[in-house]
Amino acid sequence: MAGSTLSSYEVDQKEYYNRITEEYDLHYAIKSALKYRYGIYHKIFSNINLKTMHILDAMCGGGESTGYFFRHGALVTGLDISENCCAIYRKRYPECSVVCSSILDTQFAGSSFDIVMTDSLHHLHPYVNQGMDEIRRILKPGGYFCCWEPISHSLADLLRKFLYRMDARYFLENEGSIDIKRLVQTQAHHFQMVDCVYGGNLAYLFVNLSMALRIPVRIVKFYSPLFIVAESFLDRFQPKFLSCWALCLLRKKEIFETF
């Protein structure tokens, strides 16, 4: 394990994901869940030439995000705190390197990556700012940080909090939605906003979150094509407060602003 001594939150997270690795991968790595994920990423990355870019898939799990970048010719490195997740990643993407480490202290050299991608900032509470400091350090000047996160102050956030109280099996105590507006404001000296897309309804809940909702994978495969199309249509009219997630793309400033 790279990096310094883990906090109690990180130890709990490592043990948790080591325990549920197989079940997590069964749900999040199925074809329908990946199709949904890749379609979302394409909303932001379609205008960026990813070929030969060095990308860190931070808190990568079994590499659910890596596939999108790998198929576009990027050089991808995975990072996860769970040894079991790293083992799956290594088997799935033998062409890529993977590091078993906390994102809070990666031991990568500064300015190592063109892009850092994560869908797991919400696992970092109360260390989100510390995590962003490390992400900024390892990003090249002008590099991109992209996060796909459940958002706070939304109807979906209320549902998440209800599920947390009712079912502790698939949720950790420190998990919480991300306040995107606050994140952007606190990072304004270091990053500029490039784009932010909001969305998520039927497919996000019943395809992407099938594990949390205890929906068998065989059933997800049956209805997922319809739900993905339906969500794409509903997203056109859905107000932000009804959205489940935000996909936010920030760019590291070439010169740090001190004012």
Label the model's feature ranges.
Residues 1-50, 52-61, 68, 146-169:
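Conserved class I S-adenosyl-L-methionine
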Residues 174-191:
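Short alpha-helix
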Residues 104-116:
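A short acidic, Gly/Pro-enriched loop at the edge of an enzyme's catalytic core
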Residues 129-141:
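A short glycine-rich, Lys/Arg-flanked "PGG" loop and its adjoining helix->strand segment in the class I
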Residues 160-164, 195-259:
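A C-terminal cap/extension of S-adenosyl-L-methionine-dependent methyltransferases
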Residues 62-105:
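Class I SAM-dependent methyltransferase SAM/SAH-binding core
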